From Swiss-Prot:
Part of the 50S ribosomal subunit. Forms a bridge to the 30S subunit in the 70S ribosome. The keyword Transcription regulation does not apply. One of its GO terms (biological process) is cytoplasmic translation. GO terms for molecular function: rRNA binding; structural constituent of ribosome; transferase activity. This is Large ribosomal subunit protein uL2. SMART domains: Ribosomal_L2, Ribosomal_L2_C. The keyword Transcription does not apply. It comes from Ralstonia pickettii (strain 12J). Belongs to the universal ribosomal protein uL2 family. Pfam families: Ribosomal_L2 (PF00181), Ribosomal_L2_C (PF03947). SUPFAM superfamilies: Nucleic acid-binding proteins, Translation proteins SH3-like domain. Residues 39-49 have a biased composition (Polar residues).
Amino acid sequence: MALVKTKPTSPGRRSMVKVVNPDLHKGAPHAPLLEKQIQKSGRNNNGHITTRHKGGGHKHHYRVVDFKRNDKDGIPAKIERLEYDPNRSANIALVLFADGERRYIIAPKGAVVGQAIANGSEAPIKAGNNLPIRNIPVGTTIHCVEILPGKGAQVARSAGTSAVLLAREGIYAQVRLRSGEVRRVHIECRATIGEVGNEEHSLRQIGKAGATRWRGIRPTVRGVVMNPVDHPHGGGEGKTAAGRDPVSPWGTPTKGYRTRRNKRTDSMIVQRRHKR
């Protein structure tokens, strides 16, 4: 995997930096693991915009990724090929099990074609293997971590991310996330050893606005260039500052305003990611 800076043959390619991985499969994805995706464009069932800055973009199928990995314990498997996934920053790996079934998993860092993959409490501590947290040594780097047993991985799934198992106390373990937050999870939750691959994803340069539109992202217009009817920062003669602390179009404070409201799980957070 390497970063490639394109030649300046056009203004859009002048600043483009691509991540090139020659090991990725160049053919079609595994058809039985594809699902149709209907484009919502940020609209709800009434057609109203509920999420701004979404719409357009290239059509693509959803790749069904196995985030649970709890029903193939003890069955040997190997990585058949590595693939690009347009739905996420990480690459995915097509895994062939000894019983003939194929599944997609998040490709760990250092994954190669032919690599052995194991699931279950007896699996060795090697990158890509999935185990319950009670069987993982303290200090191990992990990814694809479950928050609730059996629900499937929810944490550390993006390219280059990981978490660290800090301690085990009774039926809970402490995991430090990439944000710095330390969280308690049940020891029956599962996690995958190692880091997520494609760690150079954050270093790419898209190069032009059109490439962002291909990804289904629409432009973000600043509030200070709107009219007063459209945004609290709007209006004024010429270029004018907002005249107040940053807020959303609906007046909610932004840029640092905390929006977490899930008090039910506050007891599971040992150390918050915020400094104060």
